[in-house]
């Protein structure tokens, strides 16, 4: 999982990326390609 400063660029890396908020952190998850996981914060 990458730690990124820009969620927008992480979301645009793959069409299946979703932005989710958990425990005060913002995550980008992708069930099709799990290597595109990222978090911010």
From Swiss-Prot:
Name of the molecule in the record: Large ribosomal subunit protein bL36
Species the sequence originates in: Opitutus terrae (strain DSM 11246 / JCM 15787 / PB90-1)
Similarity remark: Belongs to the bacterial ribosomal protein bL36 family.
Protein encoded by which gene: rpmJ
PANTHER family named among the record's database cross-references: 50S RIBOSOMAL PROTEIN L36 2, LARGE RIBOSOMAL SUBUNIT PROTEIN BL36B
A GO CC annotation given for this chain: ribonucleoprotein complex
GO molecular function per UniProt: structural constituent of ribosome
Xref: HAMAP family: Ribosomal_bL36
UniProt xrefs under Pfam families: Ribosomal_L36
Keywords carried by this UniProt record: Ribonucleoprotein, Ribosomal protein
Coiled-coil blocks: none
Tagged with keyword Ribonucleoprotein: yes
Record SUPFAM superfamilies: Ribosomal protein L36
InterPro entries: Ribosomal_bL36, Ribosomal_bL36_sp, Ribosomal_L36_bact
GO biological process: translation
């Amino acid at each position: 999982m990458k730690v990124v400063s820009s969620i927008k660029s992480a979301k645009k890396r793959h069409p299946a990326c979703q932005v989710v908020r958990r425990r005060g952190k913002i995550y980008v998850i992708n069930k099709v390609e799990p290597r595109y996981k990222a978090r911010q914060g």
